[in-house]
Curated annotation (Swiss-Prot):
Name of this protein: Diphthine synthase
Catalyzed reactions: 2-[(3S)-amino-3-carboxypropyl]-L-histidyl-[translation elongation factor 2] + 3 S-adenosyl-L-methionine = diphthine-[translation elongation factor 2] + 3 S-adenosyl-L-homocysteine + 3 H(+)
Pathway the protein takes part in: Protein modification; peptidyl-diphthamide biosynthesis
Subunit structure: Homodimer.
Length: 264
């Protein structure tokens, strides 16, 4: 039979596309994972009510280590839906799952949905000017990742914007805020000292993208690091070289200081 990778969109249960909803309703079994992203405006129960079916929620271990044991056997003789926040193929994990399905002889289809990669356009920053993205992860006892700093540096050298995803530890109910991400990046700056991310760096914060009232703020790190952006999920953007229209948009819609108009 068929395994459908279905995106749920960005914020609540109403973000799923009509095609995705109709397909999920037709499926014999429905699985979902929420450890790669957060749908802040809904609950599993609301999604179940909309689809009209019970949903089996999978953990990171279920998906990454036991997909062949839990999901693929069901898809051998049933139509199965695998629901994910955002667009299903944005997460590398899901691309790997589709490869595994093909190797197991299971046919699969992808049904897209709104993604942060498109919603970030609400910042007014031009999509084609974004460079490589990166994730700011929580440091651990013997591990302090710094690759995101290098990505920002490389993008800045090319005049490109950097979209930073913020760490999610769903099993611990920990969702990194933009404030925490800025603090981590300042610590990396102290370690590396390359002037890539300082209190004078211009940043853009987007919170709850996809909701009717997202928070959009732009300013210097020293101004925003203690600001309350409301509930997660948050993303942090470090702009590269700004076009005048981008700068004007940030001033008008994100409260950026007018000083940035003089710097373009």
């Amino acid at each position: 039979m068929v395994l459908y990778f279905i995106g749920l969109g960005l914020y609540d249960e109403k973000d799923i596309t009509l095609k995705g909803l109709e397909t999920a309703r037709r499926c014999d079994k429905v699985f979902a994972e929420f450890y790669t992203s957060l749908l802040a405006g809904t609950t599993l129960e609301k999604i179940e009510e909309l689809i009209g079916k019970p949903i089996v929620r999978l953990s990171r271990e279920d998906v990454e280590l036991n997909f062949e044991r839990i999901v693929l056997p069901e898809a051998k003789d049933k139509d199965v839906a695998f629901l994910t926040a955002g667009d299903p193929m944005v997460a590398t994990t899901h691309s790997d799952l589709r490869i595994r399905a093909k190797k197991a002889g299971v046919k699969s289809y992808v049904i897209h949905a709104p993604s942060i990669y498109s919603a970030v356009a609400i910042t007014g920053l031009q999509i084609y000017k974004f460079g490589k993205s990166a994730t700011v992860a929580y440091p651990e006892k013997n591990w302090f990742p710094t690759s995101h700093y290098d990505v920002i540096r490389d993008n800045k050298e090319r005049g490109l914007h950097t979209l930073l995803f913020l760490d999610i530890k769903a099993d611990q109910n920990r969702y990194m805020t933009a404030n925490e991400a800025m603090e981590i990046l300042l610590k990396v700056e102290e370690m590396k000292g390359e002037g890539v991310f300082t209190p004078e760096t211009l940043v853009v914060v987007l919170a709850r993208a996809g909701s009717l009232e997202p928070t959009l703020r732009a300013g210097y790190v020293r101004e925003l690091i203690n600001e309350d952006f409301g509930r997660q999920p948050h993303v942090l953007i470090v702009p590269g070289r700004l076009h005048i229209v981008e700068a004007e948009y940030l001033v008008e819609f994100a409260g950026a200081p007018e000083k940035i108009l003089e710097e373009v």
